[in-house]
Amino acid sequence: MNKTAILVGTGKAALLAGLCFSALLANAATVSVDCDAGNTIMAALGSVKPGDTVLVSGTCKEQVTIAPEVVRITLDGQKKTTIQHPGGPAASPHALYNRGKEIIIKGFTVTGGLDGIHLSGPASALIDGNVVVKNTGRGIHIDKGSVARILNTTVEQSGGIGIDVTGASYAYIGVFIPRVPALAPNTIRNNGGPGINIERTSGAWIVGNTISNNKESGIAVHRNSQADVIANVINANGGDAITVSHNGGVNLSSETRRDGPNQTAAGQNNGGAGIKCMIGGYVDGPIGTLTGAKGAKDFDKSCVDRTAAP
């Protein structure tokens, strides 16, 4: 086949793809749900198609489950909608249980579940501009190979972990794509366990967030997991600012980011160390001003220490 034929074929393929995408957008629908009028999100989810938006208002006292076959939809709470788990027997103990893919969840207060937002699957979601508050277990939980982008969201007053990433999953916390400079910082505070927990062969970018007053460490990375932890403010947590253990690893800088080191504000020391490393972990990069009651660092002999001054 000559070059002209290849170019013509490529052009036709691109045109066809563009037409298909335009058709998808043209067919996208907006479904309005007023929970105060007796409508439910679950009823709307029964008929949505890829590209649709479910526009929600009111207080929705229901358990919301997004099925695995649901893809590329938006749930928009318009910053004025609450999803509140009703308690008692329900399809799931979690307020919002997502098994779908490429789901956008934005503008909600999510409360009253075992977990506030739970991804399992593998599932994928963009969680943007929400308040996840007063859930008895974890605020946001991501497992079984799921991927989440968590942006502009407050996670607070969970009974346990604030944001939990486990089971070969991945999370972008505070940044949409590592190479894009813009930050979308989250606030993770006043949770009953670590602010952020990364474990069991999982990974994360954790950039530009405020992580404070959690009962245990600000960030915990362990059990063969890895995280890039950059430009966060980590204050007044009950444990360390960052704990690394059990063959976990933390990079405190990256070629793709220029946001500066992590910080602990003056007078807001963490209860443990700035960084604690044990049982075969590693830490690489500038410590910044991370500190705690036990000083900036607490490493055992099994850890690889490649930390540096800012």
Regions found by a protein language model. Give the residues of each.
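Acidic Gly/Asp/Thr-rich repetitive segments characteristic of extracellular carbohydrate-active
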Residues: 30-57, 61-65, 305
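All-beta strand scaffolds that present successive hydrophobic residues in beta-strands
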Residues: 73-76, 103-107, 124-128, 147-151, ...
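Extracellular beta-strand/beta-solenoid scaffold signature
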Residues: 86-97, 112-119, 134-142, 157-175, ...
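N-terminal secretory signal peptides that target proteins for export/translocation
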Residues: 1-9
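Sec/Tat signal peptide C-region and signal peptidase I cleavage site
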Residues: 24-28
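Consensus "Asn ladder" position of solenoid repeat domains
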Residues: 108, 130, 135, 153, ...
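Bacterial N-terminal signal peptides
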Residues: 12-23
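Extracellular beta-strand-rich solenoid/capping regions of secreted or surface-exposed proteins
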Residues: 42, 61-74, 83-124, 142, ...
